């Protein structure tokens, strides 16, 4: 897992053909807006989160975000523990996101 600044996350993501954006916020938070093309799995699902993560392709690079960066850091750690090698946490989260947004 790597913690990336907003700028680093955006730059690395834009140059990564193997990237998947993962939003780990609640459905209510997602409904208020999200990063385009993000896959949503709520980290508060507990074991359900792990079950859904295990269905993902572990060979991809995962750019993970939440509201402020705390839950996404936890999500990256969980993903690493079940075999995902390339996870990138967005420090500051969606609350500081300056890139494209979708409602």
Region roles according to the model:
Residues 65:
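Short, surface-exposed ligand- or partner-binding patches at beta-edge/loop junctions that are enriched
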Residues 1-20, 27-61, 70-103:
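Rhodanese-like catalytic fold shared by cysteine-dependent sulfurtransferases
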